């Protein structure tokens, strides 16, 4: 409780500019935490969906049944959407060569769109991570300048005279780091996780093409 009161006292005792800096950093930190939580939920769900879909799909013995079940849904995303579009192109194509070309083009578009969707909010986290320390530093420099400018009005200089002003100024730096560090960690984790997800999409597409090629060989052999 004492720490909370101490911080409030520091905020109220700071100059208007430093107070504005603190408010801006609080807003940036709060907003970035919302994006951090949202990214964690979205990307964790995407990885879970990949695992569950691949497990069910490759264990399924009836690819047509799986396609019909998924084709009725309107909210396919990730591997399910890639499979539905790929299978539609495979059924429409006259031969495997044409099917392969159409599937590659269609899935490339889908994967790019899904990557854009997964990356939503990353630019904000990157901005917060890079800008917040400098905003905090600006508040600190401004506060220190005010603290030392006040010394000119004092007849006797002591550490007690400048300590409160410097403390208020350093709070701005601490808030800048408080906003930047979690945003940077979340950004790096999100970029790495998205890369893993996209590679999973691309690997599934390649494996699916191999499966369709085997189907084509079987049909040709029967003829």
Spans of features found by a protein language model:
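Periplasmic/extracellular loop-to-transmembrane helix junction in inner-membrane transport proteins
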Residues: 10-13, 161-165
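Hydrophobic alpha-helical transmembrane segments of polytopic membrane proteins
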Residues: 169-183
């Amino acid at each position: 409780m004492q720490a909370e009161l101490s911080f409030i006292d520091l905020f109220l005792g700071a100059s208007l500019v430093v107070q504005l800096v603190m408010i801006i950093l609080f807003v940036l930190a709060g907003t970035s935490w919302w994006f951090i939580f949202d990214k964690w939920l979205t990307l964790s769900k995407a990885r879970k969906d990949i695992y569950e879909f691949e497990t069910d799909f490759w264990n399924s013995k009836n690819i047509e049944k799986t396609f019909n079940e998924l084709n009725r849904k309107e909210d396919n995303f990730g591997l399910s959407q890639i499979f539905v579009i790929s299978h539609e192109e495979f059924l429409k194509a006259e031969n495997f060569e044409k099917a392969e070309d159409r599937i590659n083009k269609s899935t490339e578009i889908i994967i790019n769109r899904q990557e854009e969707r997964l990356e939503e909010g990353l630019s904000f986290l990157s901005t917060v991570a890079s800008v917040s320390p400098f905003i905090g530093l600006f508040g600190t420099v401004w506060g220190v300048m005010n603290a030392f400018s006040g010394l000119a009005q004092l007849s006797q200089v002591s550490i007690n005279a400048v300590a409160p002003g410097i403390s208020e100024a350093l709070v701005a730096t601490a808030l800048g780091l408080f906003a930047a560090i979690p945003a940077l960690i979340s950004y790096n984790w999100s970029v790495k996780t998205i890369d893993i997800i996209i590679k999973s999409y691309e690997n599934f597409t390649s494996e699916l093409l191999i499966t369709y090629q085997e189907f084509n060989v079987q049909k040709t052999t029967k003829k």
